[in-house]
């Protein structure tokens, strides 16, 4: 009888220990590719492919991409969101007058525990042109800076960033407007001091209104001295 009691006690202890084990983290990532367009020095639209890979529940060690035309590249990790966000910010020399290859992009993601997973994302040939910024100026009372632009054809939404040098001062969430004009309170910029500010306006074209995956993004910019 004592032996049976001992075996039962051991079984209960083992059951308790098994319940204390950590749940296995399921590595998963979100991938997206979209066409980014800007105006070059001659004012002509040029294009590049921009990629984003994000993990919400597991660190990423590396990301490699194969484009539909067979070209390969490695993505850099976000220096702030270390291990959870990888992306590329095209350099001026990466932009071409021709659109990026349309088709299926294949992403090989290596997680911190060395598990490797493959994801795909498709890119069509749809793009939008950079906005034509009409004006960037202070209001008459000096309280705000207003940026106005011509509506971007096919854009579902817009996004505005304000930079001073390489430092981002303001970044809005995507927004829609009836009249393409937005004001930024000067008090929002005062903490960064006097100097030249770059207003960077992006048009956004989504693959669908349910997922908000980007198909295309266009960016135009203009400077103002405050």
Regions from the language model: what does each represent?
Residues 128-138:
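Proline-enriched interdomain boundary motifs that mark the N-terminal boundary
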Residues 39-72:
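Post-signal-peptide N-terminal segment of Sec-exported extracytoplasmic proteins
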Residues 51, 143-155:
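Conserved aromatic anchor
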Residues 111, 188-218:
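Beta-strand-rich modules
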Residues 78-95, 180-183:
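Aromatic sugar-binding surface patches on proteins
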Residues 12-39:
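Bacterial Sec-dependent N-terminal signal peptides
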Residues 115-124, 209-223:
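Edge beta-strands of extracellular beta-sandwich domains
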